[in-house]
Amino acid sequence: MSSFSQHPDPDHVVVHLSDTHLLAGGHQLYGVIDSDAPLRRLMERLVASGQNIEALVFTGDLADQAEIGAYERLRDLVEPWAAKLDAQVVWVMGNHDEREPFSTVMMREEASQEPQDRVYMAGGLRII
């Protein structure tokens, strides 16, 4: 990456995405907004950029109505692109997200009402 200012080239590249608000079953947000297509286009652009992206950080609201199918949809859309980028995926809940479906689908753990706090390591960078 070339520098266009006084700042040095970055040691780490982290992509932060927020408020995907996906719905289950291919439904559109408010009946008109396709939440998948822009996310898919963004993932394509990230891969095409050639950047060494160490982490994709997704902060809530991941699912608009905390539906299991919405979490599955997001995970299934993002994880193949993350694998192409060799990037760690970091999932963080928002106020629309609920602990049980989040822990089951996004973290691949048993359903839990416990806080979903995590520490991730990505290329020597600790993400809390």
Predicted features along the sequence, with ranges:
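Extended active-site neighborhood of metal-dependent phosphoesterases/phosphodiesterases
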Residues: S2-Q6, I68, E72-I128
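N-terminal active-site segment of His-dependent metallophosphoesterases
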Residues: M1-E72
